Amino acid sequence: SFRGHGGPLGADLSAYFPAPDDDGSTPIALAQVIPGGHVAASQAIREQIDGARRRLDVMNPYVTDADMLGRILAAARRGVSVRLVVSQTSNNAQATAALKHYYPDLTEAGVELWELPDTVVHAKVVVADDVVSFGTVNLDAWALYRNNEIAMLARSAETAELIEERLFEPDIARSKRGVPPAGARERFESWLWNTLGSFL
Protein backbone atom coordinates (compact mmCIF):
# COMPACT_ATOMS: atom_id res chain seq x y z
CA SER A 1 0.00 0.00 0.00
CA PHE A 2 0.98 3.63 -0.28
CA ARG A 3 1.13 3.88 3.51
CA GLY A 4 3.21 0.71 3.81
CA HIS A 5 5.76 2.10 1.37
CA GLY A 6 5.96 5.38 3.26
CA GLY A 7 4.50 7.57 0.56
CA PRO A 8 1.45 9.81 0.52
CA LEU A 9 -1.75 8.61 -1.09
CA GLY A 10 -2.00 10.06 -4.58
CA ALA A 11 -4.72 12.61 -5.25
CA ASP A 12 -5.90 10.92 -8.46
CA LEU A 13 -6.24 7.14 -8.25
CA SER A 14 -8.24 6.71 -11.47
CA ALA A 15 -5.22 5.24 -13.28
CA TYR A 16 -5.06 2.48 -10.66
CA PHE A 17 -8.80 1.87 -10.47
CA PRO A 18 -10.35 2.52 -13.89
CA ALA A 19 -14.10 2.26 -14.22
CA PRO A 20 -15.14 -1.15 -15.56
CA ASP A 21 -16.64 -1.39 -19.04
CA ASP A 22 -19.47 -3.45 -17.58
CA ASP A 23 -20.72 -3.17 -14.01
CA GLY A 24 -21.86 -6.80 -14.16
CA SER A 25 -24.88 -8.33 -12.54
CA THR A 26 -23.52 -11.17 -10.38
CA PRO A 27 -23.57 -10.41 -6.65
CA ILE A 28 -20.24 -11.24 -4.98
CA ALA A 29 -19.67 -11.92 -1.30
CA LEU A 30 -16.24 -11.10 0.07
CA ALA A 31 -14.67 -13.02 2.96
CA GLN A 32 -11.24 -12.79 4.57
CA VAL A 33 -8.79 -14.68 6.72
CA ILE A 34 -7.14 -12.36 9.22
CA PRO A 35 -4.43 -13.82 11.48
CA GLY A 36 -5.59 -14.10 15.05
CA GLY A 37 -8.78 -16.07 14.59
CA HIS A 38 -10.91 -14.35 11.93
CA VAL A 39 -11.34 -17.13 9.37
CA ALA A 40 -14.53 -16.19 7.54
CA ALA A 41 -13.09 -17.16 4.14
CA SER A 42 -12.05 -20.57 5.44
CA GLN A 43 -15.49 -21.13 6.94
CA ALA A 44 -17.20 -20.04 3.72
CA ILE A 45 -15.20 -22.60 1.73
CA ARG A 46 -15.98 -25.30 4.32
CA GLU A 47 -19.70 -24.56 4.04
CA GLN A 48 -19.46 -24.49 0.25
CA ILE A 49 -17.87 -27.97 0.18
CA ASP A 50 -20.32 -29.32 2.76
CA GLY A 51 -23.25 -27.94 0.77
CA ALA A 52 -22.33 -29.65 -2.51
CA ARG A 53 -25.00 -32.09 -3.67
CA ARG A 54 -24.25 -32.69 -7.38
CA ARG A 55 -20.72 -31.61 -8.20
CA LEU A 56 -17.61 -30.40 -6.43
CA ASP A 57 -14.63 -29.25 -8.47
CA VAL A 58 -11.54 -28.04 -6.62
CA MET A 59 -8.42 -26.51 -8.16
CA ASN A 60 -5.71 -25.50 -5.72
CA PRO A 61 -1.91 -25.65 -5.56
CA TYR A 62 -1.66 -26.81 -1.93
CA VAL A 63 -4.27 -29.16 -0.47
CA THR A 64 -2.87 -30.38 2.84
CA ASP A 65 -5.42 -29.42 5.50
CA ALA A 66 -6.88 -32.58 7.06
CA ASP A 67 -10.22 -30.91 7.79
CA MET A 68 -10.70 -29.74 4.19
CA LEU A 69 -9.62 -33.12 2.82
CA GLY A 70 -12.07 -34.81 5.18
CA ARG A 71 -14.86 -32.61 3.84
CA ILE A 72 -13.90 -33.39 0.23
CA LEU A 73 -13.92 -37.11 1.08
CA ALA A 74 -17.31 -36.76 2.78
CA ALA A 75 -18.73 -35.10 -0.33
CA ALA A 76 -17.59 -37.96 -2.54
CA ARG A 77 -18.92 -40.54 -0.09
CA ARG A 78 -22.37 -38.97 -0.13
CA GLY A 79 -22.52 -39.30 -3.90
CA VAL A 80 -21.24 -35.92 -5.11
CA SER A 81 -19.18 -36.00 -8.33
CA VAL A 82 -15.81 -34.69 -7.11
CA ARG A 83 -12.78 -33.64 -9.17
CA LEU A 84 -9.53 -32.34 -7.66
CA VAL A 85 -6.99 -30.60 -9.90
CA VAL A 86 -3.43 -30.03 -8.65
CA SER A 87 0.03 -29.70 -10.17
CA GLN A 88 1.77 -32.81 -11.43
CA THR A 89 5.05 -31.27 -10.29
CA SER A 90 4.61 -28.67 -7.58
CA ASN A 91 7.00 -26.01 -6.38
CA ASN A 92 6.39 -27.47 -2.89
CA ALA A 93 7.37 -31.14 -2.85
CA GLN A 94 6.40 -31.50 0.81
CA ALA A 95 2.83 -30.30 0.18
CA THR A 96 2.53 -32.65 -2.79
CA ALA A 97 3.73 -35.59 -0.69
CA ALA A 98 1.28 -34.71 2.10
CA LEU A 99 -1.65 -34.65 -0.33
CA LYS A 100 -0.61 -37.96 -1.88
CA HIS A 101 -1.05 -39.58 1.53
CA TYR A 102 -4.78 -39.10 0.89
CA TYR A 103 -4.75 -40.40 -2.68
CA PRO A 104 -5.79 -43.98 -1.74
CA ASP A 105 -8.76 -42.76 0.32
CA LEU A 106 -9.73 -40.15 -2.27
CA THR A 107 -9.56 -42.69 -5.09
CA GLU A 108 -11.54 -45.25 -3.11
CA ALA A 109 -14.22 -42.64 -2.39
CA GLY A 110 -14.55 -41.92 -6.12
CA VAL A 111 -12.71 -38.58 -6.31
CA GLU A 112 -11.18 -37.93 -9.74
CA LEU A 113 -7.58 -36.85 -9.12
CA TRP A 114 -6.09 -34.77 -11.93
CA GLU A 115 -2.47 -33.60 -12.09
CA LEU A 116 -1.77 -30.74 -14.48
CA PRO A 117 1.65 -31.17 -16.17
CA ASP A 118 4.25 -28.60 -17.22
CA THR A 119 2.98 -25.85 -14.93
CA VAL A 120 2.30 -25.05 -11.31
CA VAL A 121 -1.41 -24.70 -10.58
CA HIS A 122 -1.94 -21.29 -9.03
CA ALA A 123 -5.73 -20.94 -9.17
CA LYS A 124 -7.64 -21.30 -5.92
CA VAL A 125 -11.13 -22.15 -7.17
CA VAL A 126 -14.00 -24.25 -5.83
CA VAL A 127 -17.21 -24.94 -7.75
CA ALA A 128 -19.88 -26.60 -5.62
CA ASP A 129 -23.08 -27.01 -7.62
CA ASP A 130 -23.80 -23.39 -8.61
CA VAL A 131 -21.62 -21.68 -5.99
CA VAL A 132 -18.13 -20.52 -6.99
CA SER A 133 -15.33 -19.33 -4.73
CA PHE A 134 -12.02 -17.92 -5.91
CA GLY A 135 -9.27 -15.80 -4.43
CA THR A 136 -6.01 -16.33 -2.58
CA VAL A 137 -6.91 -19.13 -0.15
CA ASN A 138 -4.82 -22.28 -0.48
CA LEU A 139 -6.26 -25.31 1.28
CA ASP A 140 -3.37 -25.52 3.73
CA ALA A 141 -2.92 -24.50 7.34
CA TRP A 142 -1.07 -21.28 6.56
CA ALA A 143 -3.73 -19.85 4.26
CA LEU A 144 -6.74 -21.19 6.16
CA TYR A 145 -5.68 -20.03 9.62
CA ARG A 146 -2.51 -17.88 9.65
CA ASN A 147 -2.10 -15.67 6.58
CA ASN A 148 -4.02 -12.65 5.36
CA GLU A 149 -6.23 -14.11 2.62
CA ILE A 150 -9.32 -13.19 0.67
CA ALA A 151 -12.06 -15.17 -1.09
CA MET A 152 -14.90 -14.04 -3.32
CA LEU A 153 -18.05 -16.13 -3.61
CA ALA A 154 -20.72 -16.05 -6.26
CA ARG A 155 -23.98 -17.98 -6.20
CA SER A 156 -24.59 -18.09 -9.95
CA ALA A 157 -25.23 -21.00 -12.30
CA GLU A 158 -23.95 -18.91 -15.21
CA THR A 159 -20.68 -18.10 -13.43
CA ALA A 160 -20.22 -21.72 -12.38
CA GLU A 161 -20.65 -22.90 -15.97
CA LEU A 162 -18.19 -20.28 -17.26
CA ILE A 163 -15.58 -21.43 -14.73
CA GLU A 164 -16.17 -25.04 -15.73
CA GLU A 165 -15.95 -24.25 -19.44
CA ARG A 166 -12.95 -21.91 -19.33
CA LEU A 167 -10.90 -23.36 -16.48
CA PHE A 168 -11.74 -26.86 -15.31
CA GLU A 169 -12.56 -28.59 -18.60
CA PRO A 170 -9.50 -27.36 -20.56
CA ASP A 171 -7.11 -28.04 -17.67
CA ILE A 172 -8.54 -31.49 -16.97
CA ALA A 173 -8.25 -32.30 -20.68
CA ARG A 174 -4.49 -31.59 -20.40
CA SER A 175 -4.07 -33.40 -17.09
CA LYS A 176 -3.03 -36.91 -16.13
CA ARG A 177 -4.77 -39.07 -13.57
CA GLY A 178 -3.19 -38.91 -10.14
CA VAL A 179 -2.00 -42.23 -8.75
CA PRO A 180 -1.37 -43.14 -5.10
CA PRO A 181 2.21 -43.33 -3.84
CA ALA A 182 4.01 -46.53 -4.83
CA GLY A 183 6.91 -48.05 -2.98
CA ALA A 184 7.87 -47.90 0.67
CA ARG A 185 9.89 -44.69 0.43
CA GLU A 186 7.19 -42.68 -1.35
CA ARG A 187 4.52 -43.95 1.06
CA PHE A 188 6.71 -43.07 4.05
CA GLU A 189 7.40 -39.58 2.72
CA SER A 190 3.71 -38.95 2.11
CA TRP A 191 2.86 -40.21 5.61
CA LEU A 192 5.60 -38.05 7.17
CA TRP A 193 4.61 -34.83 5.40
CA ASN A 194 0.94 -35.45 6.07
CA THR A 195 1.79 -35.84 9.76
CA LEU A 196 3.49 -32.44 9.59
CA GLY A 197 0.65 -30.98 7.51
CA SER A 198 -0.28 -28.29 10.04
CA PHE A 199 3.15 -26.74 9.43
CA LEU A 200 2.87 -26.74 5.62
Which residue ranges define each predicted feature?
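Charged, low-complexity intrinsically disordered terminal segments
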Residues: 1-200
